[in-house]
Structure formats: C-alpha cells, structure tokens
C-alpha cells in the first residue's frame, strides 16, 4: 500500500495539533493547570476526536487543550521534540511541521519570539535522536485578527532562516485572506514559500484570493475547489499543490463521509494532491492511517497511491537537490 521505494512525506501537519495525551496530563500536573478529567484515560475524549465534531470550530476546541498546558518554553521545546519523534516513529522520511507561535503563547503569555526559538531548539534536539528530515512552517492565525498576526509575523521573521514557508490558518469565514495581504507581502519579501488554508470552510473564491493575492503555491484542504471548473483547470495547469487531509475533513464535518471526499475528483482532473494528517494528535491517526483510508474508502489503487506519494515529494518545500537526496536514501 505504501511504496517503500518512494519517500513518505507529511506536508500538512500541525505541531501544536500533535501533543501526546500523556504529555498534556504530565504538563498539566507539573504546572498546576486544571484539566477537564481526573485520569489519563478519561482525558482522551476531551483532547481527541470521538466520532466527528459538528464543525471546524468545535474541532479546534480539542486543539485548545493541547496549547493550554504550554506553561513555559521548556514545555514548548518538549512538544517540538516529541513531534520529531512521532514523525520518525510513524515511518515518515520527511515532514513539514507548522505551528502558530501566537496560539501557543497566548494562554500563559509567553514571548512569541521565545516560542519560535523553543520550537526550533526542540526540533534540533529531536533531529539528533531520530532519523527523519524536518522543515518548519510558520502560521499566522487569522482568528486573532490583523494586529495579532503582525506580532506573530515579527516573531517568525526574526527566525526566518529556520523556516521554509508561512501559512494562513484559522477562521476562514470570519477573517478572509484579503485582510492579510500586507502580511504576506512581507513573507514574499523574506523569500519564504507560501501555503494557505483555503476552500475548507469558505468557497473557491478564498482559494483564488490565496493564490493570486497572498502568493500561495500550495493550498491546505481546498475541498471546495471542485465546484469551480476554472479553478480546477488553473490548479492542474500551474501545479498548485492541494494538501489533502481526508480524516481531518471528516472530523471537522467539512465532508459528511469519506465517500463524499473530493480526493478522487482532484486526481481525475490532474491536480497535484497528496495525503496528510493535519492534527494527528487530535484525530488520533498517523500517515499510515491516511493511506489505508485512501485505499479502502477513497478507492485509490496501489498505482494511484504511489503517485500520491510522489506528488508529496514534488509539492514539498525542498530544493531539487534535497528532493533527489530523499529518493536516493530509499534505494
């Protein structure tokens, strides 16, 4: 099912959406933070999906517990380290871990730039212990407004040498992309790549805006593109990558069922698309789960799954030499 001769990658993976349940438990007790459960076993339903949520916002409430325990920068570093470990242990050859320093900092008023430093340090420590390639993507969390995103951008750009790209995430309906055009001009000026959550809660116009105004060369989720034939044609022609996260889309009720997921529609239209976990800690999944689902529920053949794997390597924010090195390591 997974072709071991092709690098296995996960490009849409939130670091702050992958905090281990036992880590939440331990950090909560270490810092005297009131948790919603009195045992490790009963904590899981509060931080992981049971079935599916009613909306993206309901899904994000689970995420809130993952950052609620980030009481100091050591906690941030620990979570970053464990993200590298989890990526390696799930069999990934390469992962792009994205994170919102404002979101991670807000509960305990941590310094935003300090959070970025702690993430970088935690990832570096993880890479010493685990055999996996990792790059970082900074997130601007639109839900907190333009001013907060400016603070977030400043903290991230101070460490731009440790980032490959910037992302726009959060409440797509309440905070449309055009509010952040100036932010992403600065991102482009910093020579960072751009991806954006778009076409998930909002329609195809959100994707057009992300591509034409923000400068996105990849789109997170993008499920609503299928209702816009011109956009589908544009995506295919210009090799705009769709970072697809089928289980997450089910969990957030973005799609009603796997059968209704548009992954197949994208593939048939020749759109560059790959498989990703999104928030593996919240969804309680790994990349292998997504490939199993793609085969059993999305009805992809082994040949198509291999193409999806190759697509992921093509879409990755890597140089040609780095891409070749990933393939060479599989021989």
From Swiss-Prot:
InterPro entries listed in its UniProt record: A_deaminase, A_deaminase_dom, Ado/ade_deaminase, Metal_Hydrolase
A GO cellular-component term linked to this record: cytosol
GO molecular function: 2'-deoxyadenosine deaminase activity; adenosine deaminase activity; zinc ion binding
Active-site residues, record numbering mapped to chain: 200
Catalysed reaction, written as an equation: adenosine + H2O + H(+) = inosine + NH4(+); 2'-deoxyadenosine + H2O + H(+) = 2'-deoxyinosine + NH4(+)
Names of required cofactors: Zn(2+)
Residues involved in substrate binding: 14, 16, 170, 279
Site (Important for catalytic activity): 221
Cofactor note (record): Binds 1 zinc ion per subunit.
Coiled coil: none
The protein's Enzyme Commission number: 3.5.4.4
Binding site for Zn(2+): 12, 14, 197, 278
GO biological process: adenosine catabolic process; hypoxanthine salvage; inosine biosynthetic process; nucleotide metabolic process; purine ribonucleoside monophosphate biosynthetic process
Superkingdom, taxonomy of origin: Bacteria
UniProt cross-references to SUPFAM superfamilies, sorted A to Z: Metallo-dependent hydrolases
Keywords, alphabetical: Hydrolase, Metal-binding, Nucleotide metabolism, Zinc
One protein family per Pfam: A_deaminase
Purpose: Catalyzes the hydrolytic deamination of adenosine and 2-deoxyadenosine.
Similarity annotation: Belongs to the metallo-dependent hydrolases superfamily. Adenosine and AMP deaminases family. Adenosine deaminase subfamily.
Protein name per its UniProtKB record: Adenosine deaminase
Organism of derivation: Shewanella baltica (strain OS185)
Gene symbol of the encoding locus: add
């Amino acid at each position: 099912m997974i072709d071991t001769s092709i690098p296995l990658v996960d490009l849409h993976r939130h670091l702050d959406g992958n905090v281990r349940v036992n880590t939440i438990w331990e950090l909560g007790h270490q810092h005297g933070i009131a948790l919603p459960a009195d045992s490790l076993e009963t904590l899981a339903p509060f931080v992981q999906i049971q079935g599916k949520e009613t909306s993206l916002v309901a899904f994000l409430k689970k995420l809130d517990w993952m950052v609620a325990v980030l009481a100091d920068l050591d906690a941030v570093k620990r979570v970053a380290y464990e993200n590298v470990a989890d990526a390696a242990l799930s069999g990934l050859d390469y992962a792009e871990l994205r994170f919102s320093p404002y979101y991670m900092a807000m509960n305990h008023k941590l310094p935003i730039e300090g959070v970025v430093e702690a993430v970088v340090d935690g990832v570096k420590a993880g890479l010493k212990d685990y055999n996996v390639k990792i790059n970082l993507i900074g997130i601007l969390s639109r839900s907190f407004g333009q001013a907060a995103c400016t603070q977030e951008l400043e903290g991230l750009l101070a460490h731009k040498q440790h980032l490959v790209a910037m992302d726009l995430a959060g409440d797509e309906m309440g905070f449309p992309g055009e509010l952040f055009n100036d932010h992403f001009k600065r991102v482009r000026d910093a020579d960072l790549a751009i991806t954006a959550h778009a076409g998930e809660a909002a329609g195809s116009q959100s994707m057009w805006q992300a591509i034409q105004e923000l400068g996105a060369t990849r789109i997170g989720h993008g499920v609503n593109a299928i209702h816009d034939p011109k956009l589908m044609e544009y995506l295919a022609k210009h090799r705009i990558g769709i970072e697809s996260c089928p289980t997450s889309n089910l969990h957030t009720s973005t799609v009603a069922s796997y059968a209704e997921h548009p992954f197949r529609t994208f593939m048939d239209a020749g759109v560059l698309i790959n498989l990703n976990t999104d928030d593996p800690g919240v969804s309680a999944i790994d990349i292998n789960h997504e490939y199993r689902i793609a085969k059993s529920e999305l009805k992809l053949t082994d040949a198509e799954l291999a193409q999806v794997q190759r697509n992921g390597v093509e879409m990755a924010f890597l140089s040609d030499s780095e891409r070749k090195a990933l393939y060479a390591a599989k021989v």
